From Swiss-Prot:
GO terms for cellular component: endoplasmic reticulum membrane. Its main location: endoplasmic reticulum. It is a single-pass type I membrane protein. Pfam families: EMP24_GP25L. Residues 21-182 are lumenal. Belongs to the EMP24/GP25L family. The chain crosses the membrane at residues 183-203. Residues 30-126 form the GOLD domain. It is found in: Endoplasmic reticulum membrane. Eca and bai are essential, though not redundant, for dorsoventral patterning of the embryo. Specifically required during early embryogenesis for the activity of maternal tkv, while the zygotic tkv is not affected. Involved in Golgi organization. This is Transmembrane emp24 domain-containing protein eca.
């Protein structure tokens, strides 16, 4: 049953290695996304910013004055990438530690466009989904069969990374569980010692009280 669960988790990871969406933000708003990434894995972020036009009641391509500040932090909260890009672009980075990577985006707000409503189209691709195989085949002059073999090898490598990441998560969870159980045990022992000491003190106090009243 456990192996089936791990296999299902790996399939879901592969299926969700690429996602496309869009969201609305104001020009001073910050949006962050969490992506679980194995170590030594390439992540590519494609984005496009559109500006709301009240006259047409729709969104149009943003002006050159609007750009996006992109910041990426790894699972240790270290900054992997932080810079200002144009209103449309492609960003890539490689993870060096496994875990949750936080991708934050916000516009480089200016007084002219302050408070404007923006629509951001976002597409995040992880692992072998981030590889442009058409470009690889052209550069390396690969045949269709060679390209297919290359894709299969990359998929196997990505699955191996996902398995290693799942083991890493299991190890962290086990360590957290053991640490929690240990703390609960020591806390229970401490409570027991306190109760025993209080009981002993109460017995001594009652004995002294009865002796003072000459009841014993």
């Amino acid at each position: 049953m456990r192996d089936q669960f791990i296999s299902l988790a790996l399939i879901l990871c592969v299926l969700h290695s690429a996602c496309g969406l869009y969201f609305h933000i104001s020009e001073t708003e910050r949006k962050c996304f969490i992506e679980e990434v194995p170590d030594e894995t390439t992540v590519i972020v494609n984005y496009k910013v559109e500006l709301y036009d009240p006259r047409s009641n729709g969104f149009m391509p943003s002006s050159p004055g609007i750009g996006m500040h992109v910041e990426v932090r790894d699972s240790d909260d270290k900054i992997v990438l932080s810079r200002v890009y144009s209103s449309q672009g492609r960003i890539s980075f490689t993870s060096h530690t496994p875990g949750e990577h936080v991708i934050c985006m916000f516009s480089n707000s200016t007084a002219w466009f302050s408070g404007a409503q923006l629509r951001v189209h976002l597409d995040i691709q992880v692992g072998e989904h981030a590889i442009d195989y058409a470009n690889v085949a052209q550069k390396e002059k690969l045949t269709e069969l060679q390209l297919r073999i290359r894709q299969l090898l990359d998929q196997v490598e990505q699955i191996t990374k996902e398995q290693n990441y799942q083991r890493y998560r299991e190890e962290r969870f086990r360590h957290t569980s053991e640490s929690t159980n240990s703390r609960v045990l020591w806390w229970s022992l401490a409570q027991t010692v306190v109760l025993v000491c209080m009981g002993f003190w109460q017995m001594r106090h009652l004995k002294s009280f009865f002796e003072a009243k000459k009841l014993v």
